[in-house]
Amino acid sequence: MSAAAVVWLSMLGALVVNIQPMFLGAISEVYGFDAAQLGFISGAELGGGCIASLLALYWFPRLNLSKLISVALVVSVVGNLVTPMATTYTSLLIVRFCTALFGTGVLYAIILGVIGQMQNREKLFASAIILQVVSVAVFMLLTPELISEGSMTGVTRLMAALMASGFYAKNYLVIVSHRASDHAASKSLGLLLWGLPGLALLGLVAFDVGISSIWAFVERLGAEAGLSMDDSGLALAAGSGIGVLGAFFAAYLGMRWGRLKPFTASILGLLIACLMFMEASTWFSYMLAVGLLNLFWNFALPYLLGSIALFDKTGRLMVLIPAAQSAGFAIGPMVAGLFIVGADYRVSALVAFVAFVCCAAIVLPMLLKMKNSPVGQK
């Protein structure tokens, strides 16, 4: 039951990141914000999660994690209920930032730290991704109907209800006690900042810059291809359904092929997806591009996260994963939003292409070195 609780809570912690396309699309439809404003709203929330994760380096080995989960869930519920009341750009920016900083960001950091202490981490990551993809598909289908009356209330109430379900899952969560002295914790922090651990996290940042550059604006890319929001939602749901196969395949394959081959194949697939987004002009071509993006995103991620987990079995390194992911997901929409001219959202796919090339340049040599000289494996 503890594994199931971890998987469910990880879905809640990553929910806003995963449903960004329809969440930002809903904000655009309801409030009429432009691409740059949407990028900074996304960046503010993800930046809050990044800060929460960085602060977790201090409190993860020191504080009562069970109580912190409860506080984070309360903030997440309240933040989503308050969101429809924030009707201006600035107020919405502040509400979403605080919700991430004290709510979902804290929750996600704790859960990934807990996964770092458990066995079969690649399979846990893959299972968590499968559930996250299911949540994406649900929101893709429901969001157009939930905002049909010109309000964000339906979307945020659903998000709040899901966050509240975390209190039930928390009852089955087993957290290993790992209190550490200030000296030991500081020493661990110093070790994290140098060598392969830092390189792996930098690669994760570049990977998520690429993903988020497209993902934040993928609904808008559908609109540019001539699709209505309903049609885009159906294509995104279908594409997400294709994408879940990547996580299933990663869970089935495990370490049979190591990490280098699956990750290399994933980067090549993601580059092809970027090119397809640039040329998408029909529902089918758009859906196929979304499917490839999700397929190789979900296939690559368990191996990338698993390589990071090799370096630390206490969970302290793992709490930095949300910071790296949040940084990437915050930077991606901001950079893409600044380069988008008018309604030409295809620029976001070009930004993603460059980011994936940078990710490959960082991660592939690291994985090759780990293959030749296994690090942290037992």
Where are these regions (language model features)?
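C-terminal membrane-cytosol helix-exit motif in multi-pass small-molecule transporters
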Residues: 142-147, 155, 159-182, 362-367
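C-terminal transmembrane helical hairpin of 12-TM major facilitator-type secondary transporters
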Residues: 257-304
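A late C-terminal transmembrane helix in Major Facilitator Superfamily
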Residues: 311-345, 352
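Helix-to-loop junctions at the C-terminal end of transmembrane segments
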Residues: 52-65, 246-259, 340
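Conserved MFS/SLC helix-loop-helix module at the cytosolic interface between two early adjacent transmembrane helices
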Residues: 51-87
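Cytoplasmic helix-loop-helix junction between adjacent transmembrane helices
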Residues: 97-131
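Hydrophobic core of transmembrane alpha-helices in multi-pass small-molecule transporters
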Residues: 91-106, 205, 285-299
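Extracytoplasmic gate region of multi-pass secondary transporters
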Residues: 20-21, 196-237
